[in-house]
Amino acid sequence: MDRSESAESAESRRRRAEESGQGQLFRFWDELSPAEKEALLEQLEMLEPRELREHCQRAREAYVRESSAPQRLDDRMQPVPPEFLGSVRHSGTGELERWEREGFHQIAQNKVAVLLLAGGQGTRLGVTYPKGMYSVGLPSAKTLYQIQAERIRRLQQLASERHGETCTVPWYIMTSEFTLGPTRKFFEDHAYFGLERSDVVMFEQRMLPAVGFDGAAILEDKAKLAMAPDGNGGLYRALSDNRILEDMEGRGIQYVHVYCVDNILVKMADPVFIGFCVSKGADCGAKVVEKGYPAEPVGVVCRVDGVYQVVEYSEISPETAEKRNPNGALTFTAGNICNHFFTVPFLRAVIGSLEPRLNYHVAIKKVPYVDNEGNLVKPTSPNGIKMEKFVFDVFQFAKNFVAFEVLREEEFSPLKNADTADKDTPTTARRALLWQHYRWARRAGTHFLDETGSPIRDSHSISGEGDPPAVCEISPLVSYFGEGLESYMKDKDVSSFPFVLESSDAGPVPV
């Protein structure tokens, strides 16, 4: 093809792209090199003119709609009925052990997988790499990815010991254009943290253009649209795009535990949760925590017009948020923590015909852009719309939905913000894990001593804020959730800190 034919082809492709009504994307066209023109056209052609036009219109309309007073759902809401709500706190030991046995049975039969939602960057943390690569400052310096990988390894070991057969819990990791490359390299550099490489399956979710408040797609440089992952609800399209369910079905997987990367306390494929859901015959389930206070800005799992969904705190009036049962507990108290159970047939139904019914949600963000002079601008206030789907919006399709309440201090401490914020920071995540390990060690019979050899007294709150009385970290390879520590720690005197119990064959190691 000669240069004139190439130019004609580029111009005709440009005209087709302009059918999207987004002609402003070509305002630097004459300044672009042939390679830059090709890159811009390829990006636009992946979107299709009609889809881009509809996406920008939808974003603009959603922004206008959500900028108005939020729609209140109070009169349409009902709490999760007691018969569909399990609880760690309100269940007897026998019942919890029965669910745990069922969960371990399914894990030992190679029927359980975990699926990590890891498409987001650590922007709010102040880093440019994936959140899973972040270290919150533990004595061991382990990252979120390493902690989670080691929990899977320990869980496989526990299930195998119980049932006398080797088992595998495959780990599916949904990444994005931003996180796939760094995540894959990180795992390769760390030998997949001891997991079989074939049992760690990474796949990529779709990207959508960021849109300005005027409905125009945003350029992040002269030849590139600003793009963002399509939310954690992009999972369902990604499962289809990458044939992930086919992989699961080929392995005999029947149950999938889905969770977000940023919860340092997450129990991977929690046998109690899995067993509860399987025992109830659930096709879809959610772990929840009790709301800390009525106005806590957390979504609530409940029924709306008879179907299950997560209602955002902005959709509930203060009066409804403060409503209480006769026993004094909040009526709408099931706080969503993005920790879910799905059967593979349920996921198959979602990607088969139900996914298009999921609504998009508006996220108002600060989106870097090029101004009319071609200069890169990093805005100090929100200037753009990112459209997202939410993973939990499929609850409405469940035929048998259940919820399972767990203790916040044992299972939920998200990492979202830099340490300049008040909550959900590296410091709060680190403290949550160290407090948990301190409690485990004390229950196992460990004696923590100060520099004079005197016992360190527990603080007034053993679930507390601030640092624990003694800094103690327990490797997930030693204990998944506090089990089996007596042989290492019962009647042990520990006086050198920080203290790390690193592996089941190494014994206690002061750092």
From Swiss-Prot:
Keywords on record: Nucleotidyltransferase, Transferase
EC number: 2.7.7.-
Region of interest called Disordered, as start-end residue ranges on this chain: 1-22
Domain of life: Eukaryota
Pfam families: UDPGP (PF01704)
SUPFAM superfamilies per UniProt: Nucleotide-diphospho-sugar transferases
A molecular-function term among this protein's GO annotations: uridylyltransferase activity
The family this protein is said to belong to: Belongs to the UDPGP type 1 family.
The protein's name in its UniProt record: UDP-N-acetylhexosamine pyrophosphorylase-like protein 1
